[in-house]
Design a protein with these regions (language model features):
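Multi-pass membrane proteins that catalyze or facilitate reactions on polyprenyl-/lipid-phosphate substrates
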Residues: 1-307
Length: 307
């Protein structure tokens, strides 16, 4: 990957990390939509790059939200510990067990578009639930629901932020406290994923030519997330999730439309054999004795076969 492309993706990471629109969808879809030639990329290395962007965003959140974090730590108790632990265990277990199969089978544009649509539908449904609770009343069951949501967000397009916001609203929390819960439970998972990928990268080694893109992308992700902190308050103020659901559906529609057009062009290219007039019939039908496009059977050859 070129450093310039890493910088573009790092700049996208900040706002998409703070909004429930799935940064995990934007990172692979942008190169695909704009036509960057990444066919020879290593999937494991690509995923490590994405996690490095998440790590940059997490570092920016630790700085930008330090007052909120300090307040949480001052009031930390056994109940909050149980909520945090139960929100961490499902994504940790599923990540260790299913990370590689998910990367191999669910990393394509089609599965990402499906994830975007599924997340959008869940957000619209959750928005209709009553929202009366505050985070001070969160229980172990709430922590487990948030953990299962984060486990589901391992699939591209679902969005960790969107999944936890949806789960919190489904459990009846207000939009402000849903956002606070979402950010609180996400940080340990992001940091844990970054550590896991860091250990794997250390074992296999980072290619020399990839060090500059990794550094540039991580630094840009940190800066863009730090500069986008106002988006957190935007999500807190919004009374509905449907605008984000509409954006996700629009992006998914764009991806599905391009997939359909590509398949249509491919099908057309295979269904346009050369049409020639048969000397025997003169009716302009295909004269391809073996069914292959553009091959013409001679009358002599036909007589030899029939004899």
């Amino acid at each position: 990957m070129k450093p310039s492309r890493a910088i573009v993706l790092g700049a996208v990471q900040g706002p998409t990390e703070l909004l429930p629109v799935s940064s995990s969808a934007h990172l692979p879809l942008i190169p695909w939509l704009v036509g960057w030639d990444e066919d020879g990329r290593d999937p494991e290395l690509q995923k490590s790059f994405e996690v490095s962007l998440h790590a940059g965003a997490a570092a920016a959140l630790l700085i930008g939200q330090r007052r909120v974090i300090a307040e949480e730590l001052r009031s930390f108790d056994a109940r909050k510990a149980s909520v945090l632990a139960l929100s961490f265990l499902p994504p940790a277990v599923c990540g260790l067990a299913l990370e590689r199969p998910i990367e191999r089978r669910l990393g394509g544009p089609l599965s990402t578009a499906i994830g975007l649509l599924a997340g959008a539908a869940a957000m619209v449904v959750a928005d209709r639930r009553p929202q009366l609770r505050d985070r001070g009343r969160a229980t172990a069951a709430d922590g487990l629901a948030l953990g299962l949501a984060q486990a589901a967000a391992l699939a591209p397009g679902i969005s960790r932020n969107g999944a936890t916001l949806t789960a919190a609203r489904w459990r009846g929390f207000t939009r402000q406290h849903s956002n606070l819960l979402s950010r609180t439970v996400a940080l340990p998972v992001i940091v844990g994923a970054a550590i896991l990928k860091g250990v794997r990268l250390r074992r296999r080694g980072l290619p020399e030519e990839q060090r500059s893109p990794f550094a540039a992308g991580t630094a840009t992700s940190f800066a863009s997330t730090l500069a986008s902190q106002e988006l957190i308050r935007l999500v807190e103020r919004d009374s509905a999730l449907w605008p984000y659901a509409a954006y996700r559906a629009g992006l998914a529609g764009m991806v599905l439309g391009r997939i359909w057009r590509r398949r249509r062009r491919l099908r057309s290219s295979h269904e346009q054999p050369m049409r020639v007039a048969s000397p025997a019939s003169g009716d302009g039908s295909l004269a391809a004795g073996n069914g292959s496009p553009g091959r013409v059977s001679s009358p002599a050859g036909s007589r030899r076969k029939s004899g």
